[in-house]
Amino acid sequence: MDKRKIKVAILSMSSLLMISMTASAVLADIQRYFVGVDPSLISMVLTIPSLMGLVFAFASGPLSLHLPKKSLVIFGLVCGLTGGMVALLFGSLSIYVLLGCSLLLGVAQGMNSTMSMALIADYFVAEESGALMGLQSAFVNGGSMVLLFSSGMLAGVSWQLSYLVYLVFIPVIVIVMKNLPNDHPQTADQERPAEKSAKLNARVYFTALIMFLFGVFLFVFQTNVAMYVAAKGFGDASTSGLINTSMSAAGMLTGVLFGRMQRVLRQLIIPVSLVVGSLGMLSIFVIGNLPALFIGAMCCGFCLATINPAGTFVAANAVHASISSLAIAVVTASCSVGIFVSPLLSNAVANAAGGNLAVKFLWATLGLFGTAVLAVIGNAILDKKGIGGQKS
């Protein structure tokens, strides 16, 4: 077993995990194209992948106990390629075609977000596992940066052309087929008593709650940045693409440094990350100019690139190794639920404030800061009770 080849496969598939975010730069263009369509329906082009991501992120954990992870990964990648190509060729026919494509993208997002972390937990241990989770986050954001920039430039010609970036699924499928080994799930009679009795604990469920709240509040940025740029007259889809690219660039750098930050901050890494995200949202609400959007994007990128590997690492190390995939699936699915309901809640807040778009960023500021406080208090209680402590 060549671990270097496994790393190549994991990191290549990870580089596509945020490809559905390319829609964030063209939401305003899609809204102008489909005249009279409810804005909430337009936002679902971006949020439906999170809904399907929820279903398949959770389902992939139990499925991996019965099917090879390699097969699940390839299935997800093929769904992503299919969704992107259908959107490219037929997305202009109806908003519902785009929504259907978003469902397929969600399958890819949910399946492989869980599998990428589960594969790391399977083949790598202790500090090597944590460092690789950070590197995985760097590739998620690095890939996102390139994809967002490319799709933003293509969207400057036509929003439909932004879906050309989904062709990148083809080489990744080849890399995974060549480098990822076929694992063979254990049968019931192969399981040891400790594995059969293994259960999820309060640490996993609390981390899932934090990830849910994180998804609710941080995703305010992705679903509203293009609308905010258009409303303020700061530019077009290309401008939104550059802002999203800066978010991914900050996330990529953060992912590379994640291993070191985790060793220094330990359990404070999640609260600190949430506070940084809160400050980014606050800069958009208080200052509200184009530089503030870039600052906010970089703060959100730091938050995103830190929370995902940190939350996954906590969940995987809080339970018996035999159910680490299930723990990761629960945490990943919780984040997807938060992302899906985010525009519904933020739109309700904005409507209550008279349709003020900027108030969404204030709501996100308060929410992220409150979640940071909750994380500190909750983990202190769990530590005191000795529940789900991280394994060395």
Where are these regions (language model features)?
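Symmetry-related core transmembrane helices of the 12-TM Major Facilitator Superfamily/SLC fold
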Residues: 162-178, 360-379
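Intracellular juxtamembrane helix-capping segments at the cytosolic ends
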Residues: 111-124, 306-320
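A late C-terminal transmembrane helix in Major Facilitator Superfamily
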Residues: 316-355
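Conserved MFS/SLC helix-loop-helix module at the cytosolic interface between two early adjacent transmembrane helices
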Residues: 55-94
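Helix-loop-helix hairpin linking two adjacent transmembrane segments in secondary transporters
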Residues: 135-181
